Amino acid sequence: VMTNRKAVYRRSFKAEYFIYDVAAKSFTKLSEGAEQQVATWSPDSRHIAFVKDNNIFISDGEKEVQVTKDGKFNEVINGIPDWVYEEEFAFNRAFAWNADGTSIGWIRFDESHVKTYSLQLFEGSHPTNSQYHDYPGEYSYKYPKAGQDNSKVSLWSYDLKTGKVISLDVPVDADGYYPRIKTSPDANSLIVYTMNRHQDDMRLYSVNPFTGKSKQLIQESVPKFVKEEVVENSIVGKKNILLPSDRDGYMHLYLYDMNGKLIRQVEKGN
């Protein structure tokens, strides 16, 4: 349960989260200190992962573990997207549990070298920012213009049993993207999407969160650009992957096996 929700950008927000005990009919605060973001239960419902001050934390309702410690505003972000990713790929959570809740993988954004852009803030009316009644304020954030450097991205995972953090080896261009990391039905796999900066070449990888090794499953190359809904609406099952694609000029569904072999186009039309 969350309260005191405050918007950050278009899709992101911070809030205070509480765990509700149905039997005891009581609330317990998820975490003290700064507000939290994207609190998400593990698939086995034993833990909650969330982001606070650009770092990932995991709680079992009683004990809290800080998974990352290098998060810093306008420098390093763990588990939530930077401004570019949130706008370009329409999501606000950049971590995923594995299928049985024993591991969590995330995208790390190093935006320390990205140039800063500043905006003036005024009092306004919805909501009213009274602190800017007499003089405007200023908000500065990392905003790469076209052709400028984006955040440097990397993939990591945390083993809840051992407490070990490892790097996940999923190839991507130096200026490319990881537009999504998703849960897979297989506990030894997370699904990672990569895309080049032109956004006309997308690839799906299965990566083992315990070893860091990855395998390419699907490559989707199109003349113009891969639409965001292709990333958002693809489904990874136990035996098949269902991928939307407009490769023939119209959006259709394509069925693949888990080795990335195309089985068939599911439906047709225009």
Predicted regions mapped to residue ranges:
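Short loop/turn segments that connect beta-strands within beta-propeller blades
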Residues: 21-25, 60-63, 159-163, 208-212, ...
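Short glycine-/Asp-/Thr-/Trp-enriched loop segments that recur within the blades
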Residues: 74-90, 173-178, 223-230, 270
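Beta-propeller and related beta-repeat scaffolds in trafficking/envelope systems
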Residues: 9, 144-148, 174, 219-233, ...
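Beta-propeller fold detector
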Residues: 28-31, 64-77, 166-169, 214-219, ...
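A short loop-to-beta-strand structural motif that recurs across blades of beta-propeller domains
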Residues: 16-18, 55-57, 154-156, 203-205, ...
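Beta-strand C-termini and the immediately following turn/loop, strongest in propeller blades
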Residues: 1-11, 47-55, 60, 93-96, ...
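Predominantly five- to eight-bladed beta-propeller fold
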Residues: 3-16, 67-95, 103-167
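Asp-box/WD-like beta-propeller blade repeats and closely related beta-sheet repeat scaffolds
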Residues: 10-59, 63-94
